[in-house]
Amino acid sequence: MGVKNTERKKNMMEVKDLMTKDVICVDKDVDLKHVLDLMKKYEITKIPVVENKKLLGVITDNIIAYKLGSIRKRGVPASRLHASSVIDKEFETVEPGTDIKTILGKVGAPGPTILNVVENEKLLGVITKADLLPLVKSHSKVASIMQKKLSIVAPDDRVIHARRIMIDRNIARLPVVDHGKLVGMISDTEIAFALAELKKSIPLGQQKHHLDELLIEDVMKTPVTWVNPDTSVVDAAKIMMENNIGSLPVLENNKLVGIITRTDLLKTVNY
């Protein structure tokens, strides 16, 4: 019995085995422009905020997009907002020795999408859905897990329209479709960058008008990496890891038929 338990523990994967150790983090007093610059440089959407190495919270592209688009913050450029003004203090922490199975059980559940790995109040790393993708091994077809009920927008729709859909339906990104053809993707990240640029370059008195008229085609991400329904789940995970993206549209005969996210892929993991 003791030997079996020892073997099971030996084979058990822990958070420290998959977490990102070289964490990009910021002090609470840095300006929001610096935060956005880091997100763009390292292609990340979440950054822990610290003070004297103690974790205070997390900043996400979602929160930045919301804050910069809110009426109260209109006219205030990102360079004049501090990280502390957009920090999410409702964060979760885990210890480095936590069983990965415990983390997988949280995937898809309401709550934070980044877990901060802390020991003795010191931030050692973070673990996100992207870090868990190497666990995906299923050879089932993407068609068996893809989301078929889609929310889409057109390139000539306004950015504020896309943002409203994302808030109301609690989704992080939208496919952009023009006359049945997928032409781009828009997410919290693109919206946050666009709002920051608008506030920097447009005079205060004209910002509301420009924001109301800002079109999706002006900020959407293109070209789009996609898969077909017959792509295997494990290959889809590899594509996400190679391209550092959180979702993949599914096309069949050049028609958008579904979408898969990291969450969809991780739900196939039997660990």
Protein language model annotation of sequence segments:
Residues 114, 173, 189:
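RNA-contacting regions in translation and RNA-metabolism proteins
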Residues 2-22, 60-91, 100, 104-108, ...:
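Tandem CBS (Bateman) regulatory domains
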